[in-house]
Regions:
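Acyl-donor binding region in acyl/amide transferases
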Residues: 1-58, 163-187
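A conserved beta-strand-loop-helix scaffold within acyl/acetyltransferase catalytic domains
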Residues: 43-179
Length: 187
């Protein structure tokens, strides 16, 4: 599960650090100024933000995430996955990753996947084209698709990154193939 919203990049911060409390107080003030009906964010287990937000009166749930800090040993990374995630990866052994999906094909695939779920897309085609043009110019985006032996797209994801992190920005999967392990392979 990706981490959405606010997270602290300084790994040296702990929940009893006064800087965390200050950051969270400022964040809570900004939320108040927005006049939102509610605010929802997932925090990774062990995040120093959790206790600080609880102290400010927020209901907070921690969630196990697959925020991968070090990719130097992929075997170790996979060993840390849950049994369910490993089982999904086993199912995906006959599938392959493709990096040749174009932005237009990705958009159409995402629209189709959402339509199957009786949902509508939350961004315009034009927005995605501008985002893609800018991130491609910087060399900071990639579309991954998972295909079967018949070259059908089962799942896809639009990834962007900066010098610190990669973001699994827009994932989508075809409901017909939800049990194929394709979405696990994207991670």
């Amino acid at each position: 599960t990706q981490i959405g919203g606010v997270w602290l990049a300084d790994a040296s911060l702990s929940s009893n650090d006064s800087r965390v409390a200050e950051i969270c107080q400022d964040f809570a003030r900004q939320l108040e100024e927005l006049g939102l009906s509610y605010y929802y964010q997932q925090y990774p287990t062990g995040s120093p933000i959790v206790e600080a937000m609880r102290a400010l009166g927020f209901k907070v749930k921690e969630r196990i995430t697959y925020r991968i800090e070090d990719l130097s040993n992929l075997e170790q990374v996979i060993d840390a996955f849950s049994k369910n995630k490993k089982r999904q990866l086993q199912k995906a052994l006959s599938l392959h990753v493709d990096t040749n999906m174009g932005i237009e094909e990705f958009y159409r695939f995402h629209v189709q996947c959402l339509r199957e779920q009786s949902k509508q897309i939350s961004y315009s085609r034009e927005f995605l084209l501008v985002l893609n043009r800018k991130t491609q110019r910087l060399g900071q985006s990639q579309i991954l698709s998972i295909r079967n032996a018949d070259n059908e797209v089962l799942a896809a994801a639009y990834l962007v990154w900066d010098k610190h992190s990669m973001y699994y920005l827009i994932p989508c999967y075809d409901l017909k193939y939800k049990d194929s392990g394709a979405s696990a392979l994207l991670v």
